[in-house]
Structure formats: structure tokens, C-alpha cells
Amino acid sequence: MAVTVETLEKLERKMTLTLPVGIVESEVQSRLKKLARTIKMDGFRPGKVPMNVVSQRYGYSVHYEVMNDKVGEAFFNAANEAKLRVAGQPRISESEASPEGEMAFDAVFEVYPDVKIGDLSTAEVEKISAEVTDSAIDKTVDILRKQRRTFSQRPHDAAAQDGDRVTVDFEGKIDGEVFAGGKAEDFQFIVGDGQMLKEFEEATRGMKSGESKTFQMAFPADYHGKDVAGKTADFMVTLKKIEAAHLPDVDGALAKSLGIEDATVEGLRADIKKNLAREVKARLLARNKQAVMDALVGKAELDLPNASVQAEVNRLMEGARADLKQRGIKDADKAPMPEDIFRPQAERRVRLGLVVAELVRSNNLQATPEQVKAHIEELAASYEKPADVMRWYYSDNNRLAEVEAIVIENNVTNFVLAQAKVSDKALSFDELMAQN
């Protein structure tokens, strides 16, 4: 089969393919004969339908099928022989000029780019660090105590204050009409916990049981309830009950209730520190990995295949629709989504993927079985039965592939950090936790 390849622009190529007519017709006849042995048609016994009838009924569709198969096979064989790395699917059309006895086709497609990565020793990366402090452990202990707090009714003349659980009836109106979700009876919340909007909490703070109050509340413009977002409502609230919170003591009983094996405060704090350290490590890795990837992309020169970018745009759009559907949005699959919204993120993902792949290939940064095992062991260590978790990962190739991808990213991160100009920046525990 004769093949010619023409460069159209940047990554776009045009390949002209020729197929002997005899090969196509021979395959068409072969498939029609196989079909004739199995099809059932009125007026004929099974397997006894005349070939001319079979050809008349199915000839066009079989010919179309054969052409697709043969041209596709010819294209990818030719691309492999020419050592072309094809990005996406080719656009194939019949050529106007066909040699006698042959059919010619033009395939227009893109190839993956040659990736040029600059001198990584000049790349600048800010590497952050953070430690688990006693203050962070104290705050976690307080959170655990709050999760196990109990409540008792306060005296009738007591005023609601932060930490109290209050029971209220309320009714909110916009332009004189009660809005959806604007009315409730025997509704409970903790004053000061941030469950309610600030103005609502301020209105109930200081009220006593049996008191009623009217007030105005402005909903934020980005409020999740779109019908009331950015609008001001008139509220009437009646406070029916106030309950004081009682936190458990920090002692062996609390430790035991939290599953600490030795049921001691020291054991509880050690367990909290271990869990917080795991979270700190994960966040530092993610942040530093992001900084490395930003630096890596900045040092690379390459053109992006439009086919790859479009495929990534489609994936992002599908993910966005799935998220809307999961949140109960009606007709999420029909929601208008301009592609331009997703294109910058898609381009970055494709660019980063190509750059990382080149760095891995040229520096042998593939994941080793030992690295994969070590990573899975680290993941499994936080579970009650690590051996079961290990088996769960190794029982599925897709899960293993996900771990391998993470290990490769870690290898790339360590490789770049070893060569780049790295500046260290220490963050407090709270600063690290506050960042997304």
C-alpha cells in the first residue's frame, strides 16, 4: 500500500492511503457469504437465501463496514510504520484522484508534539513546610469534645449565648410572601457554630425562652438558594427553649470512648498527633507538587494537539454535568455549558500531561513495584485491617494504575526539587489547614 504524509500546519498532518479494490471486494463477498449462512428471511429456509438477495439487502452496509475496517487498519498500520504518534482520531475522506484499480483516501490528523524541557536548574520552586503543634492537638481535642457534648435545659429567664442549643420557630418573608424554606417549627441550632447566617444568630443571641423578635436579614449574593440570593427578608423568630452545652472532661473515659487502646490522655494526644501528621504530610505533598508542576510547565515548550484538548474539555464538561446531577439539579445533562469555560483548564492538563510524560520517559521515573507497594502500605496503615486494604488494591488493575500514577507524580516532584532553585517557607499548622 502506498502512503504519503504531508505536513499541513504545526501538529496537523495529511496522509494519503490507497487500497486495491480487489481486496475490499473480496472481503465484502467473504462477509456476505458468512451472513448468508445465518440470516433468516421470509420465504427461504435458514442458510438457503440466494447470494444476490443477500447482496441486495445487506451489500451496502457490509461494504461500508469493510471500508471502515480496512481504511482504519491501513491508517494505523501506516502510522506505526512511519513512527507517527497520532493524537485523537483521524478525519478520513475519499480522495478525488484514485489510481486505476485502487481507492484513495485522505486522512487528516494530529500528532503529539516534541516536548522541549528547559534547564531545570534555573526553575524556581517555593517549598513549604509545617509541623503539628500542641495547639493544633488541643484544638482537635476540643472538636472531639464538642462532638460528644450533651445538653440540659437552662432556666426560663436565662439568655441565649454562644454554645447554647436553641429551639425556635421562624418565618421569613420577601416582599410579603413566605419563601421556600423560609418557615420552620421546633428548629434547633447551636448559637455561634455558624450553622445559621450571622444576622440570624445575632438576632437570637440574648433572647430568652418565650420571647419573639422581628428583624431583617440580607442573603449573600452567592447564597446557595438562588431564589433568595442577594435579597433581604423580614423574619419573625420565637425562641422556645435554651439548652446549655456540657463538654466531657479530657480524661481516660474520653480516650476510651474514642477507641484509644490504653485509654489514656497521653494515648489520645499521640493518636491525634499521628492523624494530624498524616494530614499535614498529604497537604504539603499536594502543595509542593503543585509548585513543581507550575515550574515544570513554565520550562517547557510545546504545541498542544487540538484533539487532546477537545477530549479533555469533553471530560471536564461530563464531570461538571455529573456533579450537577449528583446535587439534584434538574435536567443537568441539558444544562448549557460554554466550552470556553473549560478550555484553559483543559489546555493546562494536556500540557502538563505531555511534559510529565516526557520527563518520565527521558529520566526513567516510572513507578517501580517496590514504590507502589510502599505507597499502598502507607495508605493501608490508617485502617483497622491493613492487610485487607492491601489485598483490595492489588485485586484491581485500575486501582493499581491509580497508585502508580501517584507514585510517578511523586517521582517527578522529587526529581525537579533535586535540580531546581528551591526556597523554603515555613507555614503554621493553621495557615496550612486554611489553604485549599
Swiss-Prot record:
Coiled coil: none annotated. The gene is tig. It is an enzyme of class 5 (isomerase). The keyword Isomerase applies. One of its GO terms (molecular function) is ribosome binding. This is Trigger factor. It is found in: Cytoplasm. Consists of 3 domains; the N-terminus binds the ribosome, the middle domain has PPIase activity, while the C-terminus has intrinsic chaperone activity on its own. Residues 163-248 form the PPIase FKBP-type domain. GO terms for cellular component: cytoplasm. InterPro entries: PPIase_dom_sf, PPIase_FKBP_dom, Trig_fac, Trigger_fac_C, Trigger_fac_C_sf, Trigger_fac_ribosome-bd_bac, Trigger_fac_ribosome-bd_sf, Trigger_fact/SurA_dom_sf. Keywords: Cell cycle, Cell division, Chaperone, Cytoplasm, Isomerase, Rotamase. Pfam families: FKBP_C, Trigger_C, Trigger_N. Involved in protein export. Acts as a chaperone by maintaining the newly synthesized protein in an open conformation. Functions as a peptidyl-prolyl cis-trans isomerase. The keyword Metal-binding does not apply. It comes from Albidiferax ferrireducens (strain ATCC BAA-621 / DSM 15236 / T118).
